[in-house]
Regions:
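Active-site pocket-lining/capping segments in soluble small-molecule metabolic enzymes
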Residues: 1-121, 125, 139-231, 238-804
């Protein structure tokens, strides 16, 4: 069993030393731009270099996040930024953009690339593609399950998230914030609309339907280590240093215990910010958060309350007992009541209380532990009955002391090993060092003093005295394993000269160590070749409605998606009906026979390996029936690429050599589309979505849990502004897709886009009426100068140009 790397988030300079002291073996951080957490403090270039130097002295690796989609106009600046990071000694960069991977391989081939979780690498096809591109490590989606990870076969290192916030959507597959407020998660500016309450018609109470509990795999570290995971990652670049110190130190302690087969309690982790914990999809045990803010450690339930006293029945497993100055939160349905304990509470048994009429008290035994809280400091009185409420410990004074201790610890998880050798040369003191870093690199240094040894007037300096002075390491995070003193102890020199010699050597070792990670910086100039298309305009049409196939005219391609048989909000694992899929595609091919368009089977954008196996089986059977059909997929290896691939620059398009058509991201702006089309080697390869409901989220998390699924409800969410978001199920039965209820419509821009050089446009008719195919003619008329908005609104009553 290999103990994985512990990778900690660092959102500011202040957090770096905390992460190192707490036991991180690597950290990840971001510059002021191009990172997926733009609202963290983040680092200037000078601060990044300082952080890299500091971390390397402590044998801690530094990974810099450049994990946003990159616009055409940014490519050259980003590449020169990466060149500087490489020169500074960054151990790797985390990247989302396919085009950036291509450019790094070309211009900075020795810079290690880690594929960000934003790339949504959920299957072996994507891993194979990235391995061929020289990627060293892949951060797997948080949605991956233990068995799926176990079955992955790759030579790349695998990294998974084990702790922190969970996005409701697959990372990299969420356009909700972008389309609802212009702040793109793929550009690092997510406004977190998932943390708001939504309504579902048929269910009375609004709820945090899109807000999962935080992830914690603390109790599964042994299983993770046995999966040969190379790195475990803690989320939280925007969280406090208290969170960082407590979470990282607890995970370090737990990893160290793994070696001896022991386990440790996770209660302390619950006391720093969390929305409640679950194991997420790792063991398919996701839960919805009960509130948007901090929940804390659940300690029990209230069995009795009065104005100045609370009695809480403590959970049997609780070892963290609240103390004076700690904070409690009492939660009951949508109500909560928080306060600070002002007197030392008493822990006792029920023997000290009379059994009354309260049912909760009657259910207890006399040996049950109860916590009696006599007085509280409060900002307000409780406005609901506290009995039968859940009690959470949300603040722990003792933690502040532990955080302070970690801050001042000044140590690192792995120290470099130092061998010192002292000798005389022409009576001048000479000190040599051999420093072995954690990466097995050896650093050597030598310094010679200016003051010679002399015959003593009174007392000589002994070899033991010199050895004692050489043992002092000041601030340096080294571990001395051997000191050789080649001196007979008969001469004299001031001790201050020995100390000076030692300091000079340590300073030289520091410089040599830092220098050993550096590389040469080079200026990168990209070729911005202007290209043009052939001028012929073609339309594509997305559908999952066989009626559309009968009436569609004037389109070159039809992307056919198989609709789910069961479109409820309940999710089922691997619910694949192969006969249904075969029948649907076969019928579609029969209807399309003799039509002018090419029929293309659109696979789901999320395809875990078991689904790929099922889809390929369907394809094989169809081929035997002489019903072959080309494929649209997002697996980096197809003929037709959907907009879920987040294509935002010409380099990304050029990198997908096997694809005939690639759809650019729908969340870009007018100037971005102009920049892409002029710089792409083959503009006729680009397609652009101009009409339809955009997929805002793809998720493996349920919206409804338990008995909620038994109610009558409608398949859409409603936000506080009464906007509706239709919800549909993937053909896999394992994912839900949330669409925008307001359609994207670029009808008035279509002529401008054609003049820019775009020649392929797509219209999304999935889940639309039987006559939505008429939208094609509306757009063709617009290309001829006849923009008919009234006709558009017949089929698309609510529409927007979104970010365009």
């Amino acid at each position: 069993m290999r103990i994985p790397e512990l990778l900690a988030p660092v959102g500011s300079k202040e957090h770096l030393q905390v992460a190192i002291n707490a036991g991180a073996s690597a950290v990840y951080l971001s510059g002021k731009n191009y990172g997926a957490r733009k609202f963290a403090d983040n680092f200037t270039l000078d601060e990044i270099e300082e952080a890299i130097n500091t971390a390397h002295m402590h044998n801690v690796k530094v990974y810099v996040t450049v994990n946003t989609i990159i616009k055409e106009s940014e490519l050259e600046n980003v590449m020169n930024y990466l060149s500087k990071l490489y020169a500074m000694g960054a151990d790797a960069v985390l990247v989302q953009d396919l085009g950036l991977i291509e450019l790094i391989n070309k211009h900075l081939p020795n810079l290690k690339i880690h594929a960000s979780t934003q790339l949504t690498c959920e299957n072996h096809l994507k891993l194979d593609y990235l391995e061929a591109k020289g990627i060293k490590r892949v951060v797997l989606p948080r949605e991956m399950r233990k068995e799926e990870i176990k079955n992955l076969k790759t030579n790349m290192e695998l990294e998974i998230f084990v702790h922190g916030a969970l996005c409701y959507s697959y990372s990299g597959q969420c356009l909700m914030s972008s389309f609802k407020g212009g702040r793109s998660g793929n550009r690092g500016t997510c406004a977190q609309p998932c943390r708001q309450k939504y309504r579902i018609r048929g269910i009375k109470r609004p709820d945090y339907y899109l807000s999962p509990c935080d992830l914690s795999l603390y109790d599964h570290l042994k299983e993770i280590a046995e999966l040969n995971i190379r790195s475990i990652k803690i989320e939280g670049r925007m969280r406090s240093k208290e969170y960082l110190a407590i979470v990282v130190s607890n995970y370090r302690k737990a990893l160290n215990k793994l070696k001896s087969g022991k386990t440790t309690s996770s209660e302390e982790i619950n006391l720093v910010f969390n929305r409640g914990f679950s194991e997420g999809q790792f063991i398919n045990a996701s839960k919805r958060s009960v509130r948007a803010g901090h929940v804390g450690l659940k300690i029990g339930r209230v069995i009795s309350s009065s104005k100045n006293q609370l009695v809480i029945r403590l959970n049997d497993s609780i070892t963290t007992i609240p103390e004076r100055g700690d904070g409690l939160l009492i939660v009951k349905n949508d109500n909560d009541y928080g306060f600070e304990i002002s007197q030392d509470p008493m822990v006792t048994t029920l023997n000290h209380f009379k059994k009354g009429k309260n049912k909760q008290v009657k259910d207890l035994t006399r040996k049950d532990k109860v916590l009696v809280v006599k007085k509280v400091w409060q900002n307000r009185d409780a406005d609901f009955n506290l009995n039968e409420s859940e009690a959470y410990l949300t603040k722990r004074n003792r933690l502040a002391k532990k955080v302070k201790e970690i801050e001042n610890r000044g140590s690192s998880y792995v120290k470099s090993k130092l061998i010192l050798t002292f000798s005389l040369k022409n009576k001048l003191p000479v000190l040599k060092a051999r420093l072995t870093l954690a990466n097995r690199k050896e650093i050597t240094a030598e310094v010679t003093g200016n003051t010679p040894f002399e015959k003593p007037l009174k007392k000589s300096v002994s070899a033991d005295t010199i050895k004692k002075q050489l043992q002092k390491l000041d601030k340096y995070p080294f571990e001395i394993t051997q000191i050789n003193v080649n001196y007979d102890g008969t001469l004299f020199i001031p001790i201050s000269r020995i100390n000076e010699l030692r300091r000079n050597l340590l300073e030289k070792l520091e410089k040599e160590t830092i220098s050993s990670y550096k590389h040469k910086n080079k200026r990168i100039k990209l070729d911005n070749t202007v290209n043009s298309s052939n001028g012929t305009v073609d339309f594509s049409f997305y559908t999952n409605n066989l009626k559309h196939l009968e009436y569609l005219e004037g389109v070159k391609r039809v992307y056919l998606e198989i609709p789910p048989q069961d479109d409820s909000l309940s999710l089922k694992d691997e619910n694949y009906n192969l006969n249904y899929m075969i029948s649907f595609i076969k019928k579609a091919i029969e209807i399309s026979y003799g039509k002018d368009y090419e029929l293309i089977w659109k696979w789901p954008d999320i395809t875990h390996d078991k689904l790929i196996k099922a889809l390929n089986k369907v394809r094989g059977i169809l081929n035997k029936m002489n019903c072959s059909i080309p494929i649209m997929n997002a697996n980096f290896n197809g003929e037709y690429g959907p907009y879920s691939m987040n294509i935002a620059n010409s380099s990304s398009i050029n990198s997908l050599e096997d694809y005939r058509i690639v759809t650019v991201s729908p969340e870009l702006r007018r100037q971005d589309y102009e920049d892409i089309i002029t710089c792409t080697q083959n503009p006729d390869k680009i397609e652009m979505l101009v009409q339809g409901s955009v997929e805002l989220m793809k998720t493996r998390y349920p919206i409804l849990y338990g008995n909620e699924n038994k109610r009558n409800y409608e398949n859409y969410l409603i936000d506080s502004k009464n906007n509706r978001y239709p919800i549909h199920k993937s053909i896999s039965g394992e994912e839900l897709i949330i669409f925008d209820g307001i359609e994207l419509s670029l009808l008035e821009e279509i002529s401008h886009l054609k003049n820019l050089g775009y020649s392929n446009f797509s219209i999304d008719g999935r889940y639309k009426g039987d006559d939505y195919h008429k939208m094609v003619d509306i757009y063709k008329q617009a290309l001829n100068g006849n923009i008919n908005k009234k006709e558009l609104e017949k089929y698309s009553p609510k529409n927007t140009i979104a970010n365009y």
